[in-house]
Swiss-Prot record:
Belongs to the eIF-3 subunit G family. Coiled coil: none annotated. It comes from Chaetomium globosum (strain ATCC 6205 / CBS 148.51 / DSM 1962 / NBRC 6347 / NRRL 1970). The gene is TIF35. SMART domains: RRM. InterPro entries: eIF3_g, eIF3g_N, eIF3G_RRM, Nucleotide-bd_a/b_plait_sf, RBD_domain_sf, RRM_dom. Its main location: cytoplasm. This is Eukaryotic translation initiation factor 3 subunit G. It is found in: Cytoplasm. Component of the eukaryotic translation initiation factor 3 (eIF-3) complex.
Length: 303
């Protein structure tokens, strides 16, 4: 007795697909294209649907030819062959290499010559031009040539000449910044009805208090370097490994964004010895790190 072969469910599905796709398609009539009197065309096509039935599709279309007058130089440039990385790209602008901007048409006014002449003869306008000729945009935070609102350090540094909580250098242990609350308490002692803590009252011996570690716990600004133009992907350990080649590093502070966790572009490196800091400043200023050139200088003491 012959044994019957049992097919798997996947084999049965493949068998059904093959029987469906092998429907007879050789007996279909060729497509027809008929021109009508009103200028339209009637296109008749035949095909086999999913049920294996012969279907006739009739379409009526109208061909419209639009002519556009362009600059012959522009038309010639469109026929140029692409080269380099875009040699195999199709015709037209590629989105990864070309940015298509808005075509702005310049339309001068009718009295533009008279307006230009009046503007040239205006003494106030000329005085304003002479006044602003040598002036440049200067940031109030980092003294860079950009607007203060666009400064990359506006969230972490205070404007020059102002004391603020965002000043990174002031937050690393400077004595002038710590003396602020004591001065405020002394000034507020003269106001009637205002409360002044006992430690800040006039004549209090421990007005400012002592820091943990005494004088050895304070930061030496003379041995602190300010590193700018730091990559967003930089890490504190990488900076420590680079700067520890010149001496013992006591602290590394890399400013990072609170939301993204990426570096903001600057860092502070503190050395135990100023001679090591001078050596590191001379060697690392202009050093290439993560495709960027580092700018290393001594940190300025907070005012």
């Amino acid at each position: 007795m012959a044994t019957q072969t049992k097919h798997d469910w996947a084999d049965d599905e493949d068998l059904e697909e093959t029987t469906t796709t092998t429907a007879p398609t050789t007996d279909l009539p060729p497509p027809q294209k008929i021109q009508n009197k009103d200028g339209t065309w009637t296109i008749i096509e035949y095909r086999i649907n999913d049920l294996g039935q012969k279907v006739k599709a009739t379409r009526r279309v109208r061909y419209v030819v639009r002519r556009e007058v362009v600059n012959p130089r522009v038309a010639e440039r469109k026929t140029w062959a692409k080269f380099g990385d875009s040699a195999n790209d199709p015709k037209g602008p590629a989105p990864d290499t070309t940015t298509v901007g808005e075509n702005i048409i310049f339309r001068p006014s009718v009295n533009w010559r008279k307006e230009a002449k009046d503007e040239a003869n205006d003494p106030n306008a000329q005085a304003m031009k002479d006044k602003l000729k040598d002036k440049k945009v200067k940031c109030r935070i980092c003294n860079g040539e950009h607007f203060t609102a666009r400064c990359p350090y506006k969230d972490t540094m205070a404007p020059i000449g102002e004391a603020g909580p965002a000043d990174v250098a002031a937050g690393m242990g400077d004595e002038p910044a710590a003396a602020g609350p004591a001065a405020a308490g002394a000034a507020g002692a003269g106001k009637k009805g205002s409360y002044v803590p006992p430690a800040m009252r006039a004549g209090a011996g421990g007005a400012q208090g002592e820091r943990m570690g005494g004088k050895y716990g304070e930061r030496d600004d003379l041995a602190t370097l300010r590193v700018t133009n730091v990559s967003e992907m930089a890490e504190e350990q990488e900076l420590r490994d680079m700067f520890e080649r010149f001496g013992r590093v006591t602290r590394v502070f890399l400013a990072k964004d609170r939301d993204t966790g990426m570096a903001k572009g600057f860092a502070f490196i503190s050395y135990a010895d100023r001679d090591d800091a001078v050596k590191a400043c001379n060697k690392m200023d202009g050093f290439g790190f993560r495709h960027l050139i580092l700018r290393v200088e001594f940190a300025k003491k907070a005012q």
